[in-house]
Every structure is written in C-alpha cells, then in structure tokens.
C-alpha cells in the first residue's frame, strides 16, 4: 500500500507529537477487535491530539531545522493536505497500519481509523486522491479501512470476518501488556510469520528446513516509542520459546577503556552465541565440520575446547576518533591469559605467513605486544596491535591506545560525561545482558568528515538536521521469557 493521505499525516503526527510518556496501563489497540489474528504486523499510532504530550513532541520535532520542510513535502505529496485544517479534524484517536502478510514484497497493507468526523474524513480522502493513485475505503464494523486496491480491502474483510481477532490472540496480548498504551506508537510483529519467512529464505539458499528453530520458536516482536523533553524513549521485546535467558552482568570494562569513544558495544558470554552460530552453519553446510577440523589442525588449537572458553566473559568493542582513520579497539576478559597469548600468537603467525605481512614484538609497559604491519594495504598504512595481559586480550589499530589499555588510560569511558549522561537518560540498570552507546554529537560530524575525505558529498541539510542529536544508548535485559531492548536518544 502506498502511504497516502491519512496514513502519511498519521506518521507526521507520530513524529510531531502523537502522545508519549506518562499514563500507564496496557490496554490493547482498539483496532485489535477487528484486525485478524493472522495479521503479520500491526503498527498503532496514537492520534489523540488533545493529549498534554502533544506539546512536548511538537517541541522535540522543532529542534530539527528540517522539520517544516519535511511537513511541506509530505503535504505536497499528499494532495497539499494541511495538517491542522484537513487531517487533525478528520482522524480518530488511533490510526493503525496492518500488514496482512509478507507476500507480494510486503505490499498487502491496509490502514484503519475511526474518523472523528465522517464528512471531514471523506473530504480528506478526496483531497489526498487528487494526485496519484486513489486510496479506497470500506467499512468493517465501526472502522474505516483504507487501501490502494479493492482486492486488499476484500482480503482484510474476509480475514476479519472468518477467524479470531488479534484481541483474542494470547501472543499479541502478552506482547502488548508490556507496552504503555499512551505511547506515541506501538508495534507488534507475529513471530511465526517472521520465522517462516526467514526459514524460507534460508532454505532457498540451500539451508535445511526450519533452520531457525535451532534457536527456538519466535512468538512475537513488539516495540513502543515515546518522547519527553530530553529526547526519545524506545522499548522493545523479543519473545522466544525456550527463552534466550542470557546471564545479566555488571560491565567493568568501561572503567578500563579510554574515554571519548564515539561508539561502545558491551557484551558477555559470546561463547554461547558463537556455539549457536557454529551449530547453524554446520547444519547448513555439510562439509563445514570437516573443513573446520582441517583449519584447527593447521592452527594447532580447537575452537570448541580452546577458543570458546576465552569468550565466556565480558567483551567490548569501541571506536575512537583519529586521522585519517578511526581507531578500533576490542577487549575481551579471558580466564586464562597464558592460553590466550598462545592462541593469538599462533593465529597472528599464521596470518602473517598467509598474507605475507610484517610482524614484530614491541615491549609496552612490561607486556609483549604483537604488531602486524600490512605494507601492501591501500593508503593509509594499516597496523594492528595484539596483546594478552592481566586476564584480558586486547586488539587495537593504534599503538598509543594499546599503551593506554596496558598502563591505564588518562581518563576512562566510565568517567566520560557524555556516557554518564546517556546512561542516566536511558535509565540503564547496573546489570544488563549487553548495551551499545553512541556519541552522536561528536560521531556524526566525524563520520561526515570521513565520508567527505573519501569523495562523498555531504548535504548541508544532513549536517543541520543531525546537529540536535547528542547521544543514544540501547541496552538489553531479561524480563521473564522476554528479552527486552530499551534505550533513549538524547535530542537538544
């Protein structure tokens, strides 16, 4: 369905202030009473413009200098609809967009609302239809359903009248129970539909049937978003049976890595994830286990017995500003420093021999650091540094950064004001199952400079409209059988 008329401006209502924050409760979207339980996706936008949160979200949108132009473009593409005059008086308190299935490239989509004023809504559709292909409507119960073809309207009507509704579906109710009804937007994705689509895609590529069931049965995906005076909150959940149940941990590496990171990703127990990936690959590629054994024989160590135990603890990946290229850092806490040193010394030797690159050992703070020099790499020169020390394995692309990792940084990420503020804004608890942090205020201009140095043209509009973005932090945590994903983007 091409996004037109009410659907376009419902989306703008979401951006501009379609209610957020506060409230409480977990009532289902009203459209769930008519949307068939077989639907693949439901996105419910709160268009109750009388909400007090409307002012907050309007203020948030106005921080972006390109917002007025975005509204004008949307209006022009929708028959010059005026939000205040045409849309606001017509829409009901909720607009829902429904994917009936994932067939035909995901185009089996309809939109629903209960018009505030039927005449105003009819006028809205007529005006929106003045340009491009028409948007058609029909009535299903108390709801007006819109689509770009009569076939889709008929498909929705048939599905709605012949089976149970989303409001009766337990997976849907469980997913919605975690989402505040006053949020600007709530979204639900039927897990079975997604899993089947993934399995079909993998099977089409030669994988065995039902490959993803090795991980578990995906029941649902759900998410919400809402704004406050500082920025945008978002929260999502993944329901899988059996539950993923990752072990929560208190990250300590932010207190050991330098401050000023543009990007920082924290993880734990990567051994479990790697085992799952290896199992899936083994099922997909009949010769994989044999080939892996041959590689292990050359390297002189076992992935399962030697490497994976080293990945059982906290790990971090970080990016720092540098010229001409950023500095990359990987630090993994290892239980056996001596084993880590042996494995990575052997691995670096094989890499150096196979790629014909230079290798040497540098003493840094009493630690032997292995330097790999890639003389044949395209400019600028590329060097990498590896070391195992004090229960950690470290990799970086900058010698000075390796020295900080070994001897201790001048200031740590834990003490970085931007990182501390991002954690506070996101409400991140002391223990999570992983998190990712981005310093957008410094990182986006750095990325623009890097792209420009590579010959790309960065529009001035892109620079202006990303300037209000300060930080973003996303973290995962357990909630019963759900894996929750929560976060906050700070906008000033």
Question: How should each PLM-predicted stretch be described?
Answer:
Residues 19-109, 113-131, 166-222, 227-324, ...:
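Structural boundary/hinge residues at secondary-structure and domain interfaces
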Residues 45-49, 108-114, 142, 147-150, ...:
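Extracellular/lumenal glycan-associated surfaces
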Residues 133-198, 378-460:
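A conserved glycine-rich beta-strand in the N-terminal activation segment of trypsin-fold
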Residues 134-139, 224-225, 358-363, 384-387, ...:
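Short, exposed beta-strand/loop patches in secreted or surface proteins that constitute
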Residues 247-251, 259, 387, 467-492:
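A cross-kingdom marker for long, charged
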Residues 333-364, 409-413:
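Active/binding-pocket-proximal capping segment
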